[in-house]
């Protein structure tokens, strides 16, 4: 098993409801370690840049609006197979399809307000981590 890093974000719907600690607890219980974390309020430009991969999708404007509507917590997680483990703990994008006990099944309000984001591959993890953190901000 490989120790790897992944990017994780707690979205505005969850921070508004003061769920940051509960979500981090679920991640830590799964064996993931937070090695960098900061609370940010994304500007529209930051949200557009971060989600540029979706710029041609019909939901892009709504996504940018939502992500810039309140604070988020961006973080770097580390652990064995961290990318897959984080995605497993988050659950399916649509909370209606998420397994019991996952973050999205427990906390998400809808498919749009689904409480968390996580990288889906090593390449996207590296890009997303670099978008929000300098190397000196990650302390393992």
From Swiss-Prot:
GO molecular function: ATP binding; metal ion binding; nucleoside diphosphate kinase activity
UniProt xrefs under SUPFAM superfamilies: Nucleoside diphosphate kinase, NDK (SSF54919)
Enzyme class: transferase
GO BP field: CTP biosynthetic process; GTP biosynthetic process; UTP biosynthetic process
Main localization (coarse): cytoplasm
Keywords associated with the record: ATP-binding, Cytoplasm, Kinase, Magnesium, Metal-binding, Nucleotide metabolism, Nucleotide-binding, Phosphoprotein, Transferase
GO CC annotation, single: cytoplasm
Catalytic activity entry: a 2'-deoxyribonucleoside 5'-diphosphate + ATP = a 2'-deoxyribonucleoside 5'-triphosphate + ADP; a ribonucleoside 5'-diphosphate + ATP = a ribonucleoside 5'-triphosphate + ADP
Matches recorded under InterPro entries: NDK-like_dom, NDK-like_dom_sf, Nucleoside_diP_kinase, Nucleoside_diP_kinase_AS
Top-level taxon in the UniProt lineage: Bacteria
Gene3D superfamilies found in the cross-reference section: Nucleoside diphosphate kinase-like domain
Location in or out of the cell: Cytoplasm
UniProt keyword GTP-binding present: no
Database matches in Pfam families: NDK
Residues at the active site: 117 (pros-phosphohistidine intermediate)
EC numbers for this chain: 2.7.4.6
Functional summary from the UniProt entry: Major role in the synthesis of nucleoside triphosphates other than ATP. The ATP gamma phosphate is transferred to the NDP beta phosphate via a ping-pong mechanism, using a phosphorylated active-site intermediate.
UniProt xrefs under PANTHER family: NUCLEOSIDE DIPHOSPHATE KINASE
NCBIfam families reported in the protein's UniProt record: PRK00668.1
Name of the protein in its database record: Nucleoside diphosphate kinase
Species this chain originates from: Brucella ovis (strain ATCC 25840 / 63/290 / NCTC 10512)
